[in-house]
């Protein structure tokens, strides 16, 4: 069963991003200031930062960051900076201290229109806060447990690579969005728009509130992959051993999990789901072609009573709800398996179909109302 996603902050691992990187203790108000625009007030940065920079930039440039600590990127205040031609950087530390501050490079290359924030030695417990033009492209590398949060940015390209740190994307729009992590979680809050690639290794989990775009490709290894809403033209979601739990999905969707279970609360479009050992549980709200296969698990198919479809269900056992109004139902037993075919609501065999195959498990089919599919608590 797909549960409601908890608030973003509660899903961040302990020791990872805290309070959107803004809750760390900062230094005194006499912080050192550097940069090409010393007369700028630096409004919007953390108060009492250990060090601050304000640089004048092109509003359509690129931010490149390589850090072992926490990083937060958000857009400039459009009222304070209507031209969008500044980058503001602030460093906060724990208990007024951040080791390795002198190793931090903050520079802008006007020819390449690239803003660089680089360090391999800054205190991993520090946090770097960046206010950038809203259209800035992003290329971020985080090492160790350094986490990344990007919010309210609209860009052509957003690339984030982390090791053990959490990646949070909140209300991001990008033509090309790529997130890769070796051991950190990935959390998408609000609506994330674009062509999206997310790859999470080891036990990393991917939690999504809403994705909207043309093409989405998401994979995990041992971790849970869950999404509340997917509105895409085509999506490919896979996991080696983790479960895949989806809420409302629209478009052409392919789901694969070798060891985990697959759950879809509501499918509108073409759906292909397969698992080797896991179970598959799907509610088909509006039919495209549906193909469900599990080698060793069972399959549960649910649909509203109004759905027009031709179905073919094959398994060691097949159970069709007595309340389902099925016409021309036929049963064929061969060996250890059984196949049941039928039509719903005067559909024809040439219309869109549901095909479910579970050679070692049970295939069940039942009517369920849209309200029941919401799985609201009693």
From Swiss-Prot:
It comes from the Eukaryota. Disulfide bonds: none annotated. Pfam families: DUF4097. PANTHER family: PROTEIN FAM185A, PTHR34094. This is Protein FAM185A. It comes from Mus musculus (Mouse).
């Amino acid at each position: 069963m797909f549960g409601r996603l908890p608030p973003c902050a509660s899903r961040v691992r302990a020791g990872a991003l805290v309070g959107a990187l803004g809750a760390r203790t900062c230094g005194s108000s006499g912080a050192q200031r550097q940069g090409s625009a010393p007369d700028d007030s630096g409004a919007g940065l953390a108060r009492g930062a250990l060090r601050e920079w304000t640089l004048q930039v092109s509003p359509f440039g690129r931010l490149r960051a390589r850090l072992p600590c926490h990083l937060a990127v958000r857009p400039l205040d459009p009222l304070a900076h209507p031209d969008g031609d500044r980058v503001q950087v602030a460093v906060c530390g724990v208990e007024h201290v951040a080791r390795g501050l002198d190793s931090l490079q903050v520079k802008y290359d006007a020819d390449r229109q690239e803003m660089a924030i680089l360090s391999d030695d800054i205190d991993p417990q520090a946090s770097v806060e960046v206010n950038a033009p809203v259209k800035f492209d992003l290329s971020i590398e985080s090492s160790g447990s350094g986490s990344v949060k990007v919010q309210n940015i609209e860009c052509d390209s957003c690339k984030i690579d982390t090791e053990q740190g959490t990646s949070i994307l909140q209300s991001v729009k990008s033509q090309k969005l790529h997130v890769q992590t070796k051991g950190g979680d990935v959390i998408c809050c609000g609506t994330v728009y674009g062509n999206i690639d997310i790859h999470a290794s080891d036990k990393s989990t991917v939690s999504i509130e809403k994705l909207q775009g043309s093409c989405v490709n998401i994979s995990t290894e041992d971790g849970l992959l869950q999404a509340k809403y997917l509105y895409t033209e085509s999506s490919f979601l896979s996991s080696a051993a983790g479960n895949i739990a989806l809420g409302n999905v629209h478009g052409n969707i392919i789901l694969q999990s070798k060891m985990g279970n697959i759950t879809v609360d509501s499918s509108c479009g073409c759906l292909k789901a397969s698992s080797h050992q896991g179970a598959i549980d799907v509610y088909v709200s509006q039919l495209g072609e549906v193909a469900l296969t599990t080698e060793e698990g069972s399959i549960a198919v649910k649909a509203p009573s109004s759905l027009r479809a031709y179905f073919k269900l094959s398994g060691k056992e097949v159970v069709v709800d007595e309340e389902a109004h099925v016409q021309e139902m036929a049963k064929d037993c061969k060996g250890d398996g059984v196949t049941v075919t039928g039509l719903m609501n005067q559909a024809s065999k040439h219309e869109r179909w549901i095909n479910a195959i579970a050679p070692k498990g049970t295939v069940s089919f039942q009517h369920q109302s849209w309200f029941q599919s919401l799985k609201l608590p009693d």
